[in-house]
From Swiss-Prot:
It comes from Armillaria ostoyae. Delta(6)-protoilludene synthase, part of the gene cluster that mediates the biosynthesis of melleolides, a range of antifungal and phytotoxic polyketide derivatives composed of an orsellinic acid (OA) moiety esterified to various sesquiterpene alcohols. The first step in melleolides biosynthesis is performed by the delta(6)-protoilludene synthase PRO1 which catalyzes the cyclization of farnesyl diphosphate to protoilludene. The orsellinic acid synthase armB produces OA by condensing acetyl-CoA with 3 malonyl-CoA units in a three-round chain elongation reaction folowed by a C2-C7 ring closure. Mg(2+) 2 binds at residue 81. This is Delta(6)-protoilludene synthase. One of its GO terms (molecular function) is metal ion binding. Its cofactor is Mg(2+). The gene is PRO1. Mg(2+) 1 binds at residue 81.
Length: 342
C-alpha cells in the first residue's frame, strides 16, 4: 500500500489573506513570452516550466506592483534552480560567476555559446534597475550574490551526499530560498536608509519570515524532491535524520516550529519603531510585504502545477497526499507532475 503524507496547514491562522495583483494576466503574458524566448529548456521541460507559473508567484508576492520585474525575477530564479540542481559544485560556481558578471555589467553583450542564465540575468537587471532606488539596487546585488554563493554550497553538499543538522541547514537554506533579493524588490520604489533596513527589529522580522518560507516550501516540495532523489536539501529529510523520526514525525515538528516562528514574527511586527515622516509609511509597507510573502509562497504552491499538478486546489483542502514513486528525468528542467498519483 502506498504511503500517505499529511501536509500541516501552517498558515491556518496567518493574518495576511490571499491577494493577487490585478495586472496578473497581462504581466504573465509578457514575462512568460520573455522567459520562453531564451529556449532554456527542451519542449517537454518548457511545458512543465510554464505550468509552474512563476508569474503567479510574483503576482501574489507583489500585489501592488505595476511592473513585471517580479515575474521576470521569479523566472530567473527558477532557471538558475533547475540548472544548478543537476550540476556539480564547479559547474554551479561557473554559473554564479556568469550571472553576477551579467548583472554587474548589463551593457556588455554575453559571449557566444555561454550558459543561457547569463543573458536571462542581464536582460532582467538591465530593465529592473531602471525603476529601483540606489539603495535597493545595492541591496539586490549584494543579496543576489549571497544567494548564488549558497547555491554553490548546496551543490557541494549534494555532490558529497552531506546531510546537515537542522541549525546548519537553516543557515544555508535562508540564502538558497532567494528571499533576500526578493525582499529587495519590495523596496524598489522606497528610500530606506541603512539604519532603517538594518534595525534589529526589521532584521528579526525578515529572519522569521525567511524561516517560514523555508519550512513552507520544503513541506510542499518534499514529495516531488524525494521522487527526484533530490531531497537532501529539505527540512523534512533533515528533521527525519536529526530527530530519528519518519515523514509524519518530521511534519509534526515542522508544524510546531512554524507556530513559534509565526508568534515571533507577530511580536516583532508590533515592535517596529517609528522614524517619523514618509519613512514610517515605507517601513509599514515593507513589513506588510514580508507578511504577505509568506501567504504568497503558500498560495502559489497549491494554485500552480509546480508540486501537485492540477490537484493543488483539492490538496490545499484535504492536506493528504500519496508518496510519489521515483522519477527518472528525460530532459533537464522541471517535470510535469501527474496529480493522479497524489
Amino acid at each position: 500500500m502506498s504511503q500517505r503524507i499529511f501536509l500541516p496547514d501552517t498558515l491556518a491562522n496567518w493574518q495576511w489573506p490571499r491577494h493577487l495583483n490585478p495586472h496578473y494576466a497581462e504581466v504573465k503574458k509578457a514575462s512568460a513570452a520573455w522567459a520562453q524566448s531564451f529556449r532554456a529548456f527542451q519542449t517537454k521541460a518548457q511545458e512543465a516550466f510554464d505550468r509552474c507559473d512563476f508569474n503567479l508567484l510574483a503576482s501574489f508576492a507583489y500585489p501592488l506592483a505595476d511592473e513585471g520585474d517580479g515575474c521576470d525575477l521569479m523566472n530567473l530564479f527558477f532557471v538558475i534552480d533547475e540548472y544548478s540542481d543537476v550540476s556539480t559544485e564547479e559547474e554551479v560556481r561557473a554559473q554564479k560567476d556568469i550571472v553576477m558578471d551579467a548583472i554587474r555589467n548589463t551593457e556588455k553583450p554575453r559571449p557566444a555559446g555561454e550558459w543561457i542564465g547569463g543573458e536571462v540575468a542581464r536582460q532582467f537587471w538591465d530593465l529592473a534597475k531602471k525603476t529601483a532606488s540606489s539603495q535597493a539596487q545595492k541591496r539586490f546585488i549584494d543579496t543576489f550574490d549571497e544567494y548564488l554563493e549558497s547555491v554553490v554550497q548546496q551543490a557541494a553538499d549534494r555532490n558529497n551526499s552531506h546531510i546537515r543538522g537542522i541549525e546548519s541547514y537553516l543557515e544555508v537554506r535562508r540564502c538558497t530560498i532567494g528571499a533576500k533579493p526578493s525582499f529587495a524588490l519590495l523596496e524598489f520604489d522606497m528610500q530606506l536608509p541603512d539604519e532603517v533596513i538594518n534595525h534589529p527589529v526589521i532584521k528579526e522580522l525578515e529572519k522569521s519570515c525567511i524561516d517560514m518560507l523555508c519550512l513552507g516550501n520544503d513541506v510542499v516540495s518534499y514529495n516531488l524532491e524525494q521522487a527526484r532523489d533530490d531531497d537532501g536539501h529539505n527540512i523534512v529529510t533533515i528533521a527525519m535524520n536529526e530527530l530519528r523520526t519518519d515523514v509524519a514525525g518530521a511534519m509534526i515538528w515542522v508544524d510546531e516550529y512554524h507556530k513559534q516562528l509565526e508568534s515571533r514574527f507577530m511580536e516583532n511586527f508590533k515592535k517596529v519603531p517609528r522614524w517619523g515622516g514618509p519613512i514610517d509609511l515605507q517601513v509599514a509597507r515593507y513589513c506588510d510585504g514580508l507578511g504577505n510573502w509568506v501567504r504568497a509562497n503558500d498560495q502559489w504552491s497549491f494554485e500552480s502545477e509546480r508540486y501537485f499538478g492540477k490537484k493543488g486546489p483539492e490538496i490545499i483542502q484535504r492536506r493528504w497526499i500519496t508518496l510519489m514513486p521515483k522519477m527518472v528525468s528525460e530532459e533537464l528542467g522541471p517535470q510535469i507532475v501527474d496529480g493522479s498519483h497524489l
